Swiss-Prot record:
It comes from the Viruses. The lineage of its organism: Viruses, Viruses incertae sedis, Ampullaviridae, Bottigliavirus, Bottigliavirus ABV. This is Putative transmembrane protein ORF85. Keywords: Host membrane, Membrane, Transmembrane, Transmembrane helix. It is a multi-pass membrane protein.
Length: 85
């Protein structure tokens, strides 16, 4: 399922990447329920990136971080545009 390339890198097949993306989305959904602060899942995702040492957990952590940051930026931009207009 995972081919080890060199010593620190993984080469995931496309189906595994889809499963990891879905896992990231599901994990983000659970982590976003922890706090009303939109940056909490981003911080937890970054922690997972460092705990995973470049493997599957790091990949899921990166997905969570990306979703959390894009959602937080989207909320901030929406709030700013609501105040301006």
């Amino acid at each position: 399922m995972v081919e080890i390339v060199g010593s620190n890198y993984f080469n995931f097949p496309p189906t595994t990447l889809i499963v990891l993306a879905l896992g990231s989305a599901i994990a983000y959904k659970f982590l976003s329920n922890i706090s009303t602060n939109p940056y909490v899942p981003a911080v937890l995702g970054i922690i997972l990136v460092f705990l995973g040492h470049g493997g599957v957990i790091s990949t899921i952590g990166a997905g969570i971080t990306g979703l959390a940051i894009s959602r937080a930026i989207g909320k901030d931009v929406f709030n700013f545009l609501s105040k301006v207009s």
